[in-house]
């Protein structure tokens, strides 16, 4: 609409995209710090607000009322109001979300707080409203005048500015990379970006007050969000901060309101043109240094490593991660199609002559997007789209213009901080004749989006041509976007891959003439874990009625399973099922269990949770609701407990003892002899869990510390190493891991008495067979037997390794034998010994086992074989012992 300002200048208020036109109609422009909920219904603005509406630029949409969502109630973010439309990308917590792409685009140039994307690495730091102005942060390091400043002084003592900035996550469009090959990042769709008006102080004003010294080159930022690897922090160059064209700001308002907790309340950094990961939230420190930040998150996040480096290989390349040339700062040119929407149908009989294809584009480093091209024939020819730059409307603000208490003085600035919108009218007849629509953007530096994807280990900065497939169906055109965010199904990329298409062949997975003669590999089959005939709906109350030992039910992916029939047969013992009773066991089950185990699930499937029950379980805290750090026993069978990594001690070239500090020095571990515990680590970027079972070396009665011997399986050419062991080896001291237990079907009670799946046995002789780090459960039982002079149980230990230096716990094992030489025998056999080895040589094969173990003594019935080692060893032992007439119930595999 045309409006006339008090200066007599007529402006046209533009709303883009043109449909639906609600950006201005729902605007608010209050300059106070109140966070009152605003009625979403458009109303006539009060007289004092009209001055704000008579502007040459758009104002942000009004926030709709929000509240704490049910899924957040039992998380550390239980105080934070959120919009239910946001799509969660990493489960319930931490909060990483993007809005539906169409909703984001339809809001127009500026996005509401409701739909602004969020990237949180952990819990949101809590800052009460009445403490916001008292929040302080420091400015120190290589400066002459370090100081601490409160938000109140930041507002009162410095000039304020307001201007629009588009923030973009470096992972925007990562889902496309994850479909091609799983990266270490979680799956963002194409809506990992948002634009808002930010109010605050140019950072250069603070730095000039501090007076950087001559050696200063970098500015490090650190937030208040405490994470597994310390507080989140990163850095940028000092000269960028001092350059007003860069527009780097210390912000305290977003769209005229004080910052929302998810967006950094009460103060944060805003860095236009760079990836969102540099704009640190909940700011506590600004430190000027001579080198880039050494913060863990600066080094191991927001990088584009060479495409040749796999996720597994990256775990053991610290020097590569620390190489600053792989760090991401400026955004690259990128674009997406928003209309037609994913799965939108255009009925040809009623369609207009043309269809308006439209979307967004953005550049980085202040560069403007100067062209957007569209092709309907895979790049053989291109059409030029029209581009609209709403950001330029703010450059036309009159002198002295104030918005939300900040000057909009940006007429002089040529750098581009925001996304732009493009559109093109295409004849429907041309769309009907095409197989797809593809676009590419170019910035003013003549950098154009690439045709093909550059895959990298973190899946960041993905910006190949954006492609929408056109399907002809029943007199209509159906449009299919490349992916859908998170775990949402849909998109042509998943469809093509399921059918065996090669997404890296340069033709978007379509068969080329050269590939027609090739037989494609069998598409990966998804294991069905449900029974299609089961239609029962189960409530939370019904599920909770089965949280005991008698008839335990558990949940995987929203489906309910009855574990009762498998209690006696579960390899991990009945406790593994009982401990999961009436709980969502999805993460543990999917992480630990084999494909064979998953294929067995349909026979135990009894129903599906209703929506209320699903939400209730999703919101359940993972840790005990009464997880008292002063409790006497550390392990909790149903809940994860945190232990801090204190030391790593090398015991061989590829094995270490990891020592973890418990909650307090008098706290016992709580692990019965012969049982094990679960250790969980989460990838800091993806939040995906890695869970493995380990048997500690610690004494059963040990207190305050937990020692675990772990063999590190490293990557070798052609064979990836151990995901968990390499992850454990790479985490720094002071990092915590999650631990839960005990689990296991075997427990040694002393003097030959033990239980197997709850059944009591009295054993006269144990045959213990192990290899490598499989010695640890054997170690536990042998120590218990030999430590008790009154325990007459005989033990034969057969320990296999490659070479002499690989024999783990050798001195300790020898000491155990020395304590009870009459009833304990220990034999070492090496498969690759050197010339000095005088012991047994070769593999633990049939002849070796027959010679030293002998057949099962039927008249006795009190012998038992305990086995722990690689799968190949366990299979050999199993088959040989069966041939020697040993019964399956007398063989136990840890």
UniProtKB/Swiss-Prot annotation:
GO MF annotations in UniProt: FAD binding; heme binding; molybdenum ion binding; molybdopterin cofactor binding; nitrate reductase (NADPH) activity; sulfite oxidase activity
Regions of compositional bias (Polar residues) in chain numbering: 7-16
Domain Cytochrome b5 heme-binding: 535-610
UniProt keyword annotations, A-Z: Disulfide bond, FAD, Flavoprotein, Heme, Iron, Metal-binding, Molybdenum, NADP, Nitrate assimilation, Oxidoreductase
Domain FAD-binding FR-type: 638-749
Taxonomy, superkingdom: Eukaryota
InterPro entries associated with the record: Cbr1-like_FAD-bd_dom, Cyt_B5-like_heme/steroid-bd, Cyt_B5-like_heme/steroid_sf, Cyt_B5_heme-BS, FAD-bd_FR_type, Flavoprot_Pyr_Nucl_cyt_Rdtase, FNR_nucleotide-bd, Ig_E-set
Region (Disordered): 1-79
Biological process terms in GO annotation: nitrate assimilation; nitric oxide biosynthetic process; sulfur compound metabolic process
Cofactor requirements of the protein: FAD; heme; Mo-molybdopterin
Binding sites annotated in the UniProt record for FAD: 692-695, 709-713, 723-725, 773, 776
Family under the similarity heading: Belongs to the nitrate reductase family.
Subunit-level organization: Homodimer.
Name of this protein: Nitrate reductase [NADPH]
Organism the protein comes from: Beauveria bassiana
């Amino acid at each position: 609409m045309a409006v006339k300002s008090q200066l007599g200048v007529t402006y046209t208020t533009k709303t883009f995209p043109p449909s639906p036109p609600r950006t201005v109609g729902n605007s608010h422009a209050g300059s106070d710090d109140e966070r009152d909920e605003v009625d979403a219904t458009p109303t006539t603005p009060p007289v004092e607000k009209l001055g704000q509406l008579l502007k040459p630029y758009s104002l942000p949409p009004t926030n709709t009322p929000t509240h704490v969502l049910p899924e957040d109630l039992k998380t550390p973010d239980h105080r934070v109001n959120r919009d239910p439309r946001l799509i969660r990308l990493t489960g319930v917590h931490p909060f990483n979300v993007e809005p539906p792409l169409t909703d984001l685009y339809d809001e127009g140039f500026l996005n509401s707080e409701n739909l602004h994307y969020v990237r949180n690495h952990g819990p949101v730091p809590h800052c009460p409203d009445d403490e916001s102005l008292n929040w302080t942060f420091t400015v120190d390091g290589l400066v002459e005048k370090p100081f601490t400043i409160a938000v109140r002084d930041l507002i009162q003592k410095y000039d304020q500015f307001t201007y629009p900035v588009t923030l973009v996550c470096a992972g925007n469009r990562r889902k496309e990379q994850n479909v091609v090959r799983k990266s270490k990042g979680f799956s963002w769709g194409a809506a990992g970006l948002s634009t808002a008006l930010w109010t605050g102080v140019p950072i250069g004003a603070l730095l000039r007050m501090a007076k950087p010294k001559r050696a200063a080159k970098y500015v490090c930022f650190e937030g208040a969000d405490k994470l597994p690897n310390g507080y989140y922090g990163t850095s940028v160059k000092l000269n960028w901060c001092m350059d007003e064209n860069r527009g780097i700001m210390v912000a305290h308002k977003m769209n005229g309101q004080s910052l929302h907790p998810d967006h950094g309340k009460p103060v944060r950094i805003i860095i236009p043109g760079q990836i969102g990961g540099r704009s640190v939230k909940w700011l506590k420190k600004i430190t000027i240094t001579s080198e880039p930040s050494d913060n863990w998150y600066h080094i191991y996040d927001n990088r584009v490593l060479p495409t040749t480096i796999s996720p597994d290989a990256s775990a053991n390349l610290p020097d590569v991660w620390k190489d600053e040339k792989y760090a991401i700062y400026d955004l690259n040119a990128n674009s997406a199609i928003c209309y037609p929407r994913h799965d939108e149908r255009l009925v040809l009989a009623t369609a207009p002559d043309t269809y308006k294809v439209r979307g967004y584009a953005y550049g980085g480093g202040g560069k403007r997007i100067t062209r957007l091209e569209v092709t309907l024939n895979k790049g053989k020819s291109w059409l030029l789209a029209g581009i609209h730059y709403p950001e330029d409307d703010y450059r036309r603000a009159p002198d002295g213009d104030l918005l939300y208490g900040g000057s909009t003085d940006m007429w002089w600035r040529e750098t581009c901080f925001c996304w732009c919108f493009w559109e093109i009218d295409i004849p429907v007849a041309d769309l009907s004749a095409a197989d797809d629509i593809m676009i590419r953007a170019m910035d003013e530096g003549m950098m154009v989006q690439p045709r093909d994807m550059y895959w990298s280990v973190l899946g960041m900065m993905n910006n190949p041509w954006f492609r929408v497939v056109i399907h002809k169906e029943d007199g209509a055109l159906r449009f299919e976007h490349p992916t859908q965010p998170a775990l949402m199904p849909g998109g042509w990329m998943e469809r093509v891959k399921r059918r065996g298409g090669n997404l890296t062949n340069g033709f978007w997975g379509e068969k080329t003439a050269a590939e027609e003669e090739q037989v494609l590999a069998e598409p990966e089959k998804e294991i069905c874990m449900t029974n299609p005939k089961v239609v029962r709906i189960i409530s939370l109350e019904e599920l909770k009625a089965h949280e005991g030992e008698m008839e335990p039910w558990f949940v995987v992916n929203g489906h309910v399973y009855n574990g009762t029939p498998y209690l006696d047969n579960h390899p991990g013992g009945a406790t593994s099922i009982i401990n999961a009773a009436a709980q969502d066991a999805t993460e543990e089950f999917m992480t630990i269990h084999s494909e064979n185990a998953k294929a067995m699930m349909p026979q135990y499937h009894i129903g599906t949770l209703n929506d209320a029950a699903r939400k209730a379980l999703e919101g359940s805290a993972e840790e005990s609701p009464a997880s008292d750090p002063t409790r006497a026993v550390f392990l909790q069978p149903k809940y994860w407990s945190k232990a801090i990594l204190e030391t790593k001690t090398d015991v061989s070239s590829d094995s270490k003892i990891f020592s973890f500090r418990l909650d307090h020095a008098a706290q016992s571990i709580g692990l019965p002899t012969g049982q094990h515990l679960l250790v969980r680590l989460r990838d800091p970027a993806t939040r995906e869990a890695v869970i493995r079972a380990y048997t500690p070396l610690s004494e059963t009665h040990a207190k305050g510390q937990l020692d675990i011997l772990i063999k590190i399986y490293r990557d070798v050419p052609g064979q990836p190493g151990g995901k968990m062991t390499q992850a454990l080896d790479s985490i720094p001291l002071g990092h915590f891991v999650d631990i839960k237990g005990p689990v296991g079907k075997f427990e040694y009670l002393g003097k030959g008495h033990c239980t197997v799946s709850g059944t009591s046995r009295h054993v006269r002789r144990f045959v213990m067979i192990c290899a490598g780090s499989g010695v640890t459960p054997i170690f536990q039982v042998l120590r218990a037997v030999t430590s008790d002079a009154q325990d007459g149980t005989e033990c034969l230990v057969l320990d296999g390794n490659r070479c002499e230096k690989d024999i783990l716990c050798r001195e300790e094992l020898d000491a155990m034998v020395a304590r009870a030489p009459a009833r304990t025998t220990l034999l070492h056999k090496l498969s690759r010994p050197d010339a000095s080895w005088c012991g047994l040589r070769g593999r633990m094969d049939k002849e070796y086992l027959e010679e030293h173990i002998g057949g099962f003594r039927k008249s006795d019935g009190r012998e038992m074989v305990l086995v722990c080692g690689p799968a190949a060893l366990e299979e050999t032992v199993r088959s040989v012992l069966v041939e020697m007439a040993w019964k399956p119930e007398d063989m136990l595999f840890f």
